[in-house]
């Protein structure tokens, strides 16, 4: 594909067979309404994502993993100000309470799921580097599984705007928010917010532009990656696939590419976790932004 907005991936609407089953199980196990951009890119490497997910699912559905995600979420607040009042800004732009509630539901779904994807991608990346992941001794309570399936009040599948088919205006917004983060493409979160172009424009220019890639932001992103690495070592089960096992499955070029993708998305999802929590803080305050919207 020659469209510059495209980055190789398998859309959650265009998969079938084993990959479709893998995507569905990721959503149900993590209790989230989307398959992360990173996972959609990992799906382009032959056989990798279904295998890696099978090796990881049991550890990621534990109460330990849920509490680890809660900790990462709480750590993601930037604690800087003054903050713009996003609710008042949306009112001024013509949004009513019902429309703002729809935006809120999307933000809360991503706030819940982003720290979980940070754990998953970190576990996959650490395992690829043949560093220790999982197998820790934890209490039976933390080893126990949480309910599988989407929590009450969560939409089962969020519609993501396809940047390659969007209007020129929306393509420009998606590129701007990606460039603001120094990213190679827009996160799923912003593809979902692109269903309301004015919302995406406001959060990009008025909420994120003042903070993205500042010293505080970059320090917080490093903190999240560091803590996620520590947390995946404590998982009660194994996760990911080591490079040595993949050498018989992938070509050297594929193996190198996979290593780079995992490294890149570990940092990508840390950034996005911070950004979406910051947007939510500007909408509903720090406590609402940093606590799980779907507690177990």
Swiss-Prot record:
Instruction: Describe the reaction catalysed, as an equation.
Output: an (S)-2-haloacid + H2O = a (2R)-2-hydroxycarboxylate + a halide anion + H(+); an (R)-2-haloacid + H2O = a (2S)-2-hydroxycarboxylate + a halide anion + H(+)
- Alphabetized UniProt keyword annotations: Hydrolase, Plasmid
Keyword check for Protein biosynthesis: no
> From the Swiss-Prot or TrEMBL record, what is one GO molecular function term?
2-haloacid dehalogenase (configuration-inverting) activity
Entry EC number(s): 3.8.1.10
Xref: InterPro entries: 2-haloacid_dehalogenase_DehI
**Function, as annotated:** Acts on 2-haloalkanoic acids whose carbon chain lengths are five or less.
Q: Which family is annotated?
A: Belongs to the HAD-like hydrolase superfamily. S-2-haloalkanoic acid dehalogenase family.
Q: What is this protein called?
A: 2-haloacid dehalogenase, configuration-inverting
Q: List the top taxonomic levels of the source.
A: Bacteria, Pseudomonadati, Pseudomonadota, Betaproteobacteria, Burkholderiales
Q: Its gene?
A: dhlC
């Amino acid at each position: 594909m020659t469209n510059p907005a495209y980055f190789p991936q398998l859309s959650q609407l265009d998969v079938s067979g084993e990959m479709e089953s893998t995507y569905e199980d990721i959503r149900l196990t993590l209790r989230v309404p989307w398959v992360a951009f990173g996972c959609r890119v990992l799906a382009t490497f032959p056989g990798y994502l279904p295998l890696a997910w099978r090796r990881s699912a049991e550890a990621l559905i534990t109460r330990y993993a849920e509490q680890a995600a809660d900790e990462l979420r709480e750590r993601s607040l930037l604690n800087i100000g003054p903050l713009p009042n996003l609710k008042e800004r949306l009112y001024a732009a013509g949004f009513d309470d019902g429309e703002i509630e729809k935006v809120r539901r999307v933000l809360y779904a991503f706030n819940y799921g982003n720290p979980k994807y940070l754990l998953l991608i970190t576990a996959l990346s650490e395992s690829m580097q043949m560093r220790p992941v999982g197998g820790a001794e934890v209490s039976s309570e933390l080893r126990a599984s949480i309910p599988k399936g989407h929590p009450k009040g969560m939409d089962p599948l969020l519609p993501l705007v396809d940047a390659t088919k969007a209007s020129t205006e929306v393509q420009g917004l998606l590129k701007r928010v990606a460039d603001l983060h120094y990213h190679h493409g827009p996160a799923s979160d912003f593809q979902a917010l692109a269903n309301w172009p004015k919302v995406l424009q406001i959060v990009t220019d008025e909420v994120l532009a003042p903070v993205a890639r500042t010293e505080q932001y970059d320090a917080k992103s490093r903190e999240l990656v560091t803590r996620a690495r520590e947390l995946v070592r404590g998982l009660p089960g194994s996760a990911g696939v080591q490079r040595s096992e993949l050498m018989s499955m992938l070509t050297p070029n594929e193996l190198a590419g996979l290593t780079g993708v995992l490294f890149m998305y570990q940092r990508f999802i840390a950034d996005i976790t911070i950004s979406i929590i910051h947007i939510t803080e500007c909408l509903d305050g720090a406590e609402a932004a940093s606590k799980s919207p779907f507690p177990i």
